[in-house]
Amino acid sequence: PYEKIGAELVKEVAKKTDDVAGDGTTTATVLAQALVREGLRNVAAGANPLGLKRGIEKAVEKVTETLLKSAKEVETKEQIAATAGISAGDQSIGDLIAEAMDKVGNEGVITVEESNTFGL
């Protein structure tokens, strides 16, 4: 039963990451697994679980603050293409995303669907 709880926790982390960011599920899963492993190791060694929780929350706050300070706005079509190309691992896809975003504007919606036809 404990294994199932852990698996459900990691599954929820991946789902929430995908819902919020649309990317990063592998990183989130690896981080969640490390947090659980190290948390259990520390509790087994006598650490206070509530103290660990508070420490994790403080660390998350600091990391979030640091990331937000270093974040840069992505505004131009070229920046969007570069960012999307890196995320997709394919610059041509990045260019397509930038073109689509340019056409629909900031308030527009882009729907991406999987196709069974290759190259069409």
Swiss-Prot record:
Keywords: ATP-binding, Chaperone, Cytoplasm, Isomerase, Nucleotide-binding, Stress response. Belongs to the chaperonin (HSP60) family. It catalyses: ATP + H2O + a folded polypeptide = ADP + phosphate + an unfolded polypeptide. Its EC number is 5.6.1.7. The gene is groEL. GO terms for molecular function: ATP binding; ATP-dependent protein folding chaperone; isomerase activity. Together with its co-chaperonin GroES, plays an essential role in assisting protein folding. The GroEL-GroES system forms a nano-cage that allows encapsulation of the non-native substrate proteins and provides a physical environment optimized to promote and accelerate protein folding. This is Chaperonin GroEL. It is found in: Cytoplasm. It is an enzyme of class 5 (isomerase). Its main location: cytoplasm. Forms a cylinder of 14 subunits composed of two heptameric rings stacked back-to-back. Interacts with the co-chaperonin GroES. The keyword Chaperone applies. GO terms for biological process: protein refolding. One of its GO terms (cellular component) is cytoplasm. The keyword DNA-binding does not apply. ATP binds at residues 23-27. It holds the Pfam family Cpn60_TCP1.
